[in-house]
Amino acid sequence: MNSRLQEIRERQKLRRQLLAQQLGAESPDSIGAVLNSKDEQKEIEETRETCRASFDISVPGAKRKCLNEGEDPEEDVEEQKEDVEPQHQEESGPYEEVYKDSSTFLKGTQSLNPHNDYCQHFVDTGHRPQNFIRDGGLADRFEEYPKQRELIRLKDELISATNTPPMYLQADPDTFDLRELKCKFDVILIEPPLEEYYRESGIIANERFWNWDDIMKLNIEEISSIRSFVFLWCGSGEGLDLGRMCLRKWGFRRCEDICWIKTNKNNPGKTKTLDPKAVFQRTKEHCLMGIKGTVRRSTDGDFIHANVDIDLIITEEPEMGNIEKPVEIFHIIEHFCLGRRRLHLFGRDSTIRPGWLTVGPTLTNSNFNIEVYSTHFSEPNSYLSGCTEEIERLRPKSPPPKSMAERGGGAPRGGRGGPAAGRGDRGRERNRPNFRGDRGGFRGRGGPHRGFPPR
């Protein structure tokens, strides 16, 4: 109880500090001097209305007086204006508000609280709106969902038990033929060094940039399995369209867009180098996900487990010059696809990971051996990590398809052009050859009976 009370007090203290900064007060204790109460605001409005009313009434009265006494109306009106205007300025002067910040124009101006106007809060404080998303990290994301948290724990244990030893190969994809890996991969993660990353960070790159024409020339279609997935980091600019073109060229269909949202809680107000091709500062990146072959979540539970994670990654923005992607992308891929043949292109020493083959030009060493790597998948279906009964029970699944009886149907009903066209027996009779129609129980034309029988 004491810890909970202490937490509430700390939040209240932080809230008062933010309000003091927002309202331009010297300290959190002086917020009351800056804010006006509702009674004071009402009194100010009444005084203003009185001043305006007295000014509006005084001028016509002076004009009528001039006309009654026969004096020159223009001279008297000018004299009255000179008498009234200084008085109006003196009366209304003390009540003119000086806007020190944008607090008056925020949502809910009657209380002068910032409420949830996160865009204006960013302008005033430098805190990005995504800083206030709750439970964004891996540790506390499923804190209120014990079933999902248990599922994640069980899947992590299974993945760590079935992962292959980490392997890595120092090679430049520009000159290295990927077909020499002699393996068809279930998952391929591509992290090309785009020029966009270095333009935003304002640093000089140690490796050459890759344009989208070079990325499209990669032989991804030659090293991907019949049913497989590719994850392509494409930045936040022109790569969103050009990345889709790459997926189509490699034989993949775009099925998802994983968005990395960058927060600045530790360094609010920090401004990045503005990209000359952008109007605003970009605070997110995209990872396009492509699918090859036929994979259905309802029938291919041995290969994919859908809806285990979300399609958002919310982490703190890396330091200036750091272009590494969040490690959470590996968790998303491993939780989703049960294939164990995983390839990471353009990897670095910091991204070497169990269960993955890392290939990149900046790696400092190599331990990849084709024969050793192939032995991990020599048995039938050994490329799959498998699934336990508990994981199968906890994971989200598609609802089972309803049977004909549950949908309220018995025998197939007639339709247009189907085997039972029309309605009931008449539709089935119509499908017989040489059918001429029955009317009133008597067949065709002529004969002893014509037309309908008498009633």
Swiss-Prot record:
Keywords: Differentiation, Nucleus, RNA-binding, Spermatogenesis. GO terms for molecular function: mRNA binding; mRNA m(6)A methyltransferase activity. Residues 37-51, 423-441 have a biased composition (Basic and acidic residues). Residues 134-135, 236-237, 254-257, 277-286, 307-311 are annotated as: Interaction with METTL3. Residues 69-82 have a biased composition (Acidic residues). Residues 244-253, 296-297 are annotated as: Positively charged region required for RNA-binding. Residues 407-421 have a biased composition (Gly residues). InterPro entries: METTL14-like (IPR045123), MT-A70-like (IPR007757), SAM-dependent_MTases_sf (IPR029063). Heterodimer; heterodimerizes with mettl3 to form an antiparallel heterodimer that constitutes an active methyltransferase. Component of the WMM complex, a N6-methyltransferase complex composed of a catalytic subcomplex, named MAC, and of an associated subcomplex, named MACOM. The MAC subcomplex is composed of mettl3 and mettl14. The METTL3-METTL14 heterodimer forms a N6-methyltransferase complex that methylates adenosine residues at the N(6) position of some mRNAs and regulates the circadian clock, differentiation of embryonic stem cells and cortical neurogenesis. In the heterodimer formed with mettl3, mettl14 constitutes the RNA-binding scaffold that recognizes the substrate rather than the catalytic core. N6-methyladenosine (m6A), which takes place at the 5'-[AG]GAC-3' consensus sites of some mRNAs, plays a role in mRNA stability and processing. Belongs to the MT-A70-like family. This is N(6)-adenosine-methyltransferase non-catalytic subunit METTL14.
